[in-house]
A protein has these predicted regions:
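Class I SAM-dependent methyltransferase Rossmann-like catalytic core
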Residues: 2-57
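Conserved SAM-binding loop of SAM-dependent methyltransferases across substrates and taxa
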Residues: 68-80
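Conserved SAM-binding motif I beta-strand of class I
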Residues: 82-87, 158
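S-adenosyl-L-methionine
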Residues: 88-121
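Conserved acidic residues
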Residues: 59, 81, 126
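A short acidic, Gly/Pro-enriched loop at the edge of an enzyme's catalytic core
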Residues: 119-128, 132
Length: 214
């Protein structure tokens, strides 16, 4: 799973790649270093739903945060024209470029997504999926006009969670102050059916899928 819990130095932190997950060396509550899982392939069902939302219009899709490439794979399976991916971590950006090597409709941009936006390196998109390391506190980019990279009817969805160093679940906007607050966002409930734990989300519990249409 992609990363929400690390500071600006995250992009230079060494990651460790395992078969089903990715870890980073992190300081625990006792002050000792311990491996923290920051991405895990148990998120397939959630990422599939996010991909369905952002690719509903087809066309040009922007994905922020490549992670393990799970959501990217589902986005590619949709009827889309182009797929732009912004990834800030150097190791993951390398993996994204390897993944995209045989996909002519994919463009990989390495860098902080806010910088890429402010530097006007992006076009307009029909769908956007946000799952970067540091999504919290990003509301201003969507509230203060003009947000210039959305076509009319563009569908935005974003990972609905908080600190991934702790077990947690997705929350509705009015249930947790740390959820990204973008006016006009609707939430659709998704029942977690798998018996595999998803960041503290147990079988039968609900994850709330955000959607905003511009």
């Amino acid at each position: 799973m992609k990363k929400k819990c690390f500071k600006k130095s995250y992009k230079n932190t060494l990651l460790y790649f395992h078969k089903n997950y990715i870890t980073v060396e992190n300081t625990n509550h006792s002050g000792r270093f311990a491996d923290t899982i920051i991405m895990h392939d148990c998120e397939h069902p959630i990422m599939k739903e996010h991909a369905k939302i952002c690719t509903k219009n087809g066309g040009d899709i922007l994905e922020v945060g490549f992670g393990m490439g799970i959501s990217a794979g589902y986005i590619q399976s949709g009827s889309i024209k182009s797929h732009t991916i912004i990834e800030n971590h150097f190791q993951i950006a390398d993996r994204a470029r390897d993944w995209a090597a045989d996909k002519p409709n994919v463009t990989i941009i390495e860098g902080d997504w806010r910088d890429v936006y402010l530097e006007k390196k992006l076009k307009k998109y029909d769908g956007i999926f946000l799952d970067p390391n540091d999504i919290m506190g990003s509301e201003k980019m969507f509230i203060d006009p003009p947000f210039t990279i959305t076509k009319p009817g563009c569908i935005l969805t974003f990972y609905n969670g908080i600190n991934r160093s702790d077990v947690h679940r997705g929350y509705k906007e009015n249930e947790n102050p740390e959820v990204l607050k973008i006016p006009g966002t609707e939430f659709r409930s998704f029942k977690w059916k798998q018996d595999t734990l998803f960041w503290g989300l147990h079988q039968g519990e609900i994850y709330f899928l955000p959607k905003k249409v511009f």
